[in-house]
């Protein structure tokens, strides 16, 4: 893990989305026409530099990263939506930090240490304390999600010989090695957690002659890791979890398309695997019974209870999906990028305004439909997008 990844995360909102093209059929499609819904936009500012990026939010807080004076380093920040103040969360002794998510009093992310390594952290907004989650004997760790009192991610093992998924309890400070489907020598990582109990991710599977990766489900109550398989294909990868549903991608590994990629949804209760086809192969997300993803050009949602697939209908360019919360899907459309918010209940799409310039990206939404992201803030004769700041979009009337 390197500082390069940290900085890429911090400036993701200001970069153009790189999308992999795909094609194919998946489920039934329902067309719709976009209907604009007004949003107000607030420039969240910076920590003294000229660049900031909004990554995630909840009802009280927006988190992201910002440059310091001189634009040499990025620090994680928390923006209080009530007081409209931005706080520098600092680092674990290194020069840079970035955020991944926020839930109530806890912000999770990654930071460099004094040794130049990268470690996962939890920052408590009440105590103003950043806790280093450490490793399993190696030099680095990375955090991906939080649910309830549990944080999940991956950490390097002794001698950096491997990397294992972990679960960290913010109450006890206990970090649990979830192992891998291939035993102690295998590699695994956790992508998400649901209900404070079910963790999903991807792990090596010991097969001859090669090592194959499969999606897994880990139950914190039974301490059991279950191989979700690949539905007859060659490999699978879990990307997200919500409620009792895991989503991800699988490779078919069969002729005539041995490397064909399909999206999937897995029901934890029934253990049923649903093939979402080759329209849902990138940035696959899930919230409740709705999955969202893209084929690399067009973004779609799928109602997992009916099987109906709906294109987001945002024009002729490519569309990327960055997140889904409740009934709101967010991402960006290109050329641009231009941030959008799409509501699954009304099937309406809205291009979100930038405070200045043109370009913007949307990273995540909260349950009320507010959106965090990054947007151009200045317009001048030489460049219409000379500065990018973290922003908060709020539906009017909320």
Task: Give residue spans per PLM region.
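Residue-level hotspots at or immediately adjacent to binding/recognition sites across diverse folds
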Residues: 2, 27-398
């Amino acid at each position: 893990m390197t500082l390069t990844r940290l900085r890429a995360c911090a400036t993701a909102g200001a970069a153009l989305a790189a999308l992999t093209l795909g094609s194919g059929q998946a489920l039934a499609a329902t067309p719709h026409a976009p209907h604009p819904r007004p949003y107000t936009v607030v420039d969240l500012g910076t920590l003294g530099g000229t660049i900031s990026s909004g990554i995630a939010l909840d009802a009280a807080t927006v988190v992201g990263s910002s440059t310091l004076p001189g634009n040499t380093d990025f620090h994680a920040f928390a923006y209080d939506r009530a007081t409209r103040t931005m706080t520098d969360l600092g680092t674990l002794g290194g020069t840079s930090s970035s955020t991944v998510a926020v839930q109530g009093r806890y912000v999770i992310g990654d930071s460099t240490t004094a040794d130049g390594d990268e470690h996962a952290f939890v920052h408590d907004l009440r105590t103003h304390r950043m806790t280093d989650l450490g490793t399993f004997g190696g030099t680095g760790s990375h955090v991906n999600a939080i649910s309830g009192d549990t944080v999940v991610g991956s950490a390097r093992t002794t001698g950096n010989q491997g990397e294992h998924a972990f679960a960290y309890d913010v109450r006890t400070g206990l970090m649990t090695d979830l192992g891998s489907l291939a035993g102690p020598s295998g590699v695994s990582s956790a992508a998400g957690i649901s209900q404070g109990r079910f963790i999903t991710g991807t792990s090596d599977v010991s097969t001859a002659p090669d090592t194959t990766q499969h999606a897994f489900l880990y139950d914190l109550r039974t301490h059991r890791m279950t191989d979700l398989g690949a539905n007859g294909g060659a490999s699978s990868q879990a990307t997200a979890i919500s409620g009792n549903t895991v989503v991800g991608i699988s490779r078919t590994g069969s002729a005539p398309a041995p490397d064909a990629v399909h999206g999937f949804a897995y029901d934890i209760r029934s253990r049923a695997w649903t093939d979402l086809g080759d329209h849902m192969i990138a940035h696959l997300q899930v919230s409740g019974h709705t999955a969202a993803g893209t084929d690399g050009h067009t973004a779609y949602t799928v109602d997992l209870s009916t099987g109906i697939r709906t294109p987001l209908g945002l024009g002729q360019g490519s569309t990327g999906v960055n997140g889904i919360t409740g009934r709101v899907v967010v991402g960006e459309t290109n050329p641009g990028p231009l941030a959008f918010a799409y509501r699954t209940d009304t099937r309406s799409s809205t291009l979100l305004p930038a405070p200045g310039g043109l370009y913007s990206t949307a990273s995540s939404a909260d349950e009320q439909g507010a959106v965090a992201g990054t947007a151009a803030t200045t317009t001048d004769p030489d460049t219409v997008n000379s500065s990018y700041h973290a922003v908060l979009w709020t539906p009017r009337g909320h």
